[in-house]
Every structure is written in C-alpha cells, then in structure tokens.
UniProtKB/Swiss-Prot annotation:
Transcription factor. Acts during mitochondrial stress by activating the mitochondrial unfolded protein response (mtUPR). Required during mitochondrial stress for the activation of genes involved in the mtUPR, in concert with histone deacetylase hda-1. In response to the citrate-induced mtUPR, positively regulates transcription of transcription factor nhr-80, thereby leading to modulation of lipid metabolism. May play a role in modulating the decline in protein homeostasis associated with normal aging. Required for embryonic development and maintenance of mitochondrial morphology. This is Homeobox protein dve-1. Its main location: nucleus. GO terms for molecular function: DNA-binding transcription activator activity, RNA polymerase II-specific; DNA-binding transcription factor activity, RNA polymerase II-specific; enzyme binding; protein-containing complex binding; protein-folding chaperone binding; RNA polymerase II cis-regulatory region sequence-specific DNA binding. It is found in: Nucleus; Cytoplasm, Cytosol. The keyword Secreted does not apply. One of its GO terms (biological process) is mitochondrial unfolded protein response. It comes from Caenorhabditis elegans.
Length: 468
C-alpha cells in the first residue's frame, strides 16, 4: 500500500466528460491505495473510500505527473488490468489522480433550469430593449426573438455562428466604452427640473437627493432608457455649484480698489500734462503722496526681511483704502519731491510715441465716467490675474518702475497697490492685460536681485584689481 494524492472535480452538465480535462474542484486529499488494485478499478475504489460512491457511475480518471498535462488511463497503458503498484509505486510522490465526474440530473431539474434561464433572458431584454434595436442582421434578430419566445426549434450551424459573431461584436463595443462615461440628462425633460431644484437648494441633503432621484427615474423618459444612479445626480449638483462659483461677481474689495483707481487716474493724467506743458494750475503730485501714505510697521529701507513681509501682505485682504487730497500748487511746491523726478518723467514721456499723449483721455476727469471705466477694468483684471507671465512696456512702464525703485526698493503693500492701479489706468493697458499686485511685487523682487548681482560683480572686479 502507498499514498496517492487525489483531486475530485465535477464537470458542468452542458460540457462533455470525455473532452474535459478540468472542472470545479470538490476535494483535494490523499488516499491510501492498495498495490493489488487494478487500474480500471482505481477510480471506483478511491471514490468509495472518500464517500463519493454515487459519483462512480459517471466518473473518469486521469493521471497527472507533476505539472504535466493530465492523461487518461488508456494513454498510459494498453493493459487496464495491470496493478497500480507496478505502474505508480516508484513515482507515487509525483503522481496525482484526478477524477472528473458529471452530476446526474433528472428531467425535472433540467426543466426548472431552462425556465429560469428563459426568465432571466426576458428580464435582461426588457431592461435594455436597445439591444434588439441595434441588431442590423435580420437573421440574428429572428433567432433572438425565437429564443426569447421559448421555441424549441433547433438551430443550424450558420445561425449559431451568426449569433456568436454578433455577441462578440457586442462585447467588444462594451469593452471600448469608457468606464467613466457621464450620464447625459435629457435637456427637455430633466435639465429644467434639475435647475429648478438647484435654485431652491444648491446643496440638498441626502433625503432630498433620493427624492429627486426617484422622481427622475419614474419619469416616462427613463422607462425606455437607463436609470440614473445616486452618484450621477450628486455629480451634477457638484458641477453646477462649481460653475456658479466660477461665474461669481467681483468681490467688494476689488470694486473698492477700482473706485479708488478712478479717483487716482484724473490726478495722475493731469500731473503728466502739466509737467509737459507747464500749465500753472492745481495739480496732484503722485510721488509726494506716495511718501505721505505709509502704513505703521512698514519699512521703506531695503532690508532682507521686507521681502517676506510684502509677500505675505499681498495675499491679505485689507479693508482700509487710502485717500487722496488735491493741494494747491504753492503747498505742493514746498513739499515736492526732487526735481530729477519730473525731469525723468518728461524724458520718458518724450521718448515714447505720440500715442501716449493721445491716449490720455481728458474726458475721464468726470467722476461718473471714471468710476464706470474703473469697474470695467477691475472685472477684466480678475480674469487676467491668472496669467503666469506679463511683459511691461519698455517705453512707458519700465521708466516709471525704475523711478519708483530708486525712491524705495522695498515698497509697502499700499504702495504696490497704488503702483498697480496707476499702471493699469495708463493708455497702454487699455489694449493689453491688466497688471496684478503680484506682478509688481515680483518685478521689484527681481530688480533687487539684479542690483545685488551688480554689486557682487563690482566687488569681484575691485578685488581682482587689488590682487593684480
């Protein structure tokens, strides 16, 4: 006697027992086999020892050595009356006895299974009627209708091949479909109802969502189309809220800044015209006002810590807005900035094209028109603030920035806001994207880095000359 590994498997009723090499495993165990047992009695003896004697009537034995293909008994030896000891005793540790059995079913169970299959088929077709409408081959459509009706008519090989080909095409189209396909709501029956629900409650509760879902799925449109899931209607509300936030109006801080810019623009344009033509009228000295309007705690001296302070202040929304007062010319002359500033402005403006002078709109001195234009500029600056790179005009904007940098390399956040509004209200920015405070801050930061590089280069040259 010697041990042998035994695997018992069952084959489906629609499969052929003689053609199958594997099935559904029932047990995997070891059996002690007597050496005198013949090969043709091995399957019956082992099944009786394992308690599956009822399966021996429709059972078939296979011998598998290691991982090789299982072989039936008649392919191993021609003499089926030979003993197991002579055949497998020396290699019993490498041999597996695989027993395939086909369960015996009576006519009643077969009839019940066929009825269940027909019910499942009808339910699937009724659930998705588009399957039959998309069939182009009339022969395949007739065969499917015959099967659904429960007709026992036998099909020939041509009809079976046509049906199998259509099923393969259907599975291929399903595989190609995107797994994240978006459920399309009907624009005539469903979208108006969804919009109405969204206006009443943009963020409904789970109970409301389920109520909306049941109403949509019970509509006549969804009787012949796929039903909507809970996740799909949640995604619609999420996307609707996101789109409404994107189209939200400009906040009050930006509007207030735009109104302040409307007050600043007339004085700034008037100052430019009077500095060019020497008109003896009341004017507004912008540079002098920048020196007067400072924030407590800010620093005008160049220090490394200011970069972090100004970077943080750009991201903070401040409610305090600066005020501008127009003084008579005698008072301004007494506290005016250096004469080099006016000369530099005249030179920068004279070097530009005549379009700058023509672009200075004298009619903008009206308070109403200035406020309207500033509001439009503020709206456009909101959408253009996301630009990653912005070029300053080398003829009209860079000279002004250079002059501001000479006055204060580390401007406060209030000064940066004033600089931004002044640049955006120039004629050049009417046809180009508006500038943000971040752009001005980055320009000053890069300009300070450039000065530092120049100083380091000059020191290196001086050191080289000293050593030479």
């Amino acid at each position: 006697m010697f041990p042998m590994r035994v695997i018992v498997e069952t084959v489906r009723s629609q499969h052929c027992l003689t053609c199958s090499n594997e099935g559904h495993m029932i047990t995997d165990t070891y059996a002690i086999v007597a050496g005198t047992t013949t090969l043709n009695q091995l399957v019956e003896t082992v099944l009786a020892a394992l308690g599956h004697s009822s399966m021996s009537t429709s059972a078939r034995g296979l011998i598998q050595v290691n991982n090789w293909k299982p072989l039936p008994f008649d392919q191993i030896t021609e003499n089926l009356d030979d003993t197991v000891e002579n055949l497998f005793k020396d290699i019993s540790s490498h041999v597996v006895l695989k027993i395939l059995s086909k369960p015996s079913t009576d006519s009643n169970s077969v009839q019940c299974i066929s009825e269940v299959k027909n019910k499942l088929l009808k339910a699937a077709v009724n659930k998705n009627p588009n399957v039959l409408t998309n069939v182009d081959n009339q022969q395949v459509k007739d065969v499917i209708n015959t099967i659904i009706a429960g007709d026992e008519t036998l099909l020939n090989s041509e009809q079976i091949g046509a049906v199998n080909e259509w099923l393969d095409t259907l599975e291929t189209n399903e595989d190609r479909r995107s797994p994240t396909q978006v459920q399309r709501f009907n624009t005539l029956y469903e979208i108006p109802r969804l919009d109405k629900w969204f206006k009443s409650d943009a963020n409904p509760s789970k109970q409301k969502m389920n109520n909306y879902l049941s109403q949509l799925n019970q509509s006549p449109f969804r009787k012949n189309n796929s039903k909507i899931s809970y996740q799909q209607i949640c995604n619609w509300f999420t996307q609707k809220r996101s789109s409404s936030r994107t189209l939200a109006p400009v906040d009050l801080v930006q509007v207030s800044s735009a109104q302040t810019a409307a007050q600043l623009l007339p004085g700034f344009q008037l100052n430019l015209l009077q500095s060019l033509f020497g008109e003896q009228r009341q004017k507004f000295d912008f540079y002098d006002k920048l020196d007067e309007t400072k924030i407590v705690g800010g620093s005008d001296s160049p220090s490394p810590a200011d970069d972090e302070i100004h970077s943080n202040s750009d991201e903070t929304i401040q409610d305090t807005l600066f005020s501008i007062n127009i003084k008579p010319e005698p008072e301004i002359d007494s506290i005016a900035s250096s004469p080099d500033m006016a000369n530099s402005m005249r030179e920068s403006l004279s070097s530009t094209s005549p379009k700058l002078l023509s672009g200075l709109d004298l009619g903008a001195f009206s308070t109403h028109s200035s406020s309207t234009n500033s509001m439009q500029n503020a709206n456009s600056s909101v959408f253009s603030a996301a630009r990653s790179r912005l070029m300053f005009d080398p003829l009209t904007e860079l000279p002004v920035l250079e002059k501001w940098f000479e006055e204060n390399p580390h401007p406060t956040w209030m000064q940066i806001d004033q600089y931004t509004q002044c640049l955006n209200n120039c004629a050049y920015r009417e046809n180009y994207p508006h500038i943000s405070q971040h752009n001005v801050k980055i320009w000053f930061k890069n300009r300070r880095a450039k000065c530092k590089r120049l100083l380091n280069g000059m020191q290196e040259k001086l050191e080289q000359k000293v050593f030479v």
